[in-house]
Amino acid sequence: MENKKISIASDHAGVSLKDLVSEHLSREGHEIINHGTFNNDSVDYPDYAKKVTNDIISQVSDFGILICGTGQGMAITANKQVGIRAALCYEPEIAELSRSH
């Protein structure tokens, strides 16, 4: 994959995974826009999902990654935005298939 600009966000349950994913993608040469959250304090996941979807809609980012406790809340919130198609991806094969449909 060529280098992309990727917006990423999580709620408090996904901070550690978000940080790992961000670091990996950055090492691979992608530009990361990290919308938080940045600690384990309880937050409302829809606030963070909207930051990422707004970046995609306004073409600030090529892709978005949303992480929460189950992934469901972020995906549901993202899919409420016109033009956004979010998929719950829990392994590499599912992520690849979500991009091919």
Question: What residue ranges belong to the model's regions?
Answer:
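Solvent-exposed alpha-helices and their adjacent loops that cap or buttress functional pockets
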Residues: 1, 56-60, 99-101
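C-terminal binding/interaction regions
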Residues: 4-16, 92-101
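Glycine-rich phosphate/diphosphate-binding loop of Rossmann-like nucleotide-binding domains
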Residues: 7-27, 32
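Residues at secondary-structure transition points
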Residues: 12, 16, 40-47, 69, ...
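A short beta-strand-loop structural module common to alpha/beta enzyme folds
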Residues: 31-42
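Short, structured active-site "lid" loops
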Residues: 48-70
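Mid-chain, well-packed structural core segment of small domains
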Residues: 64-101
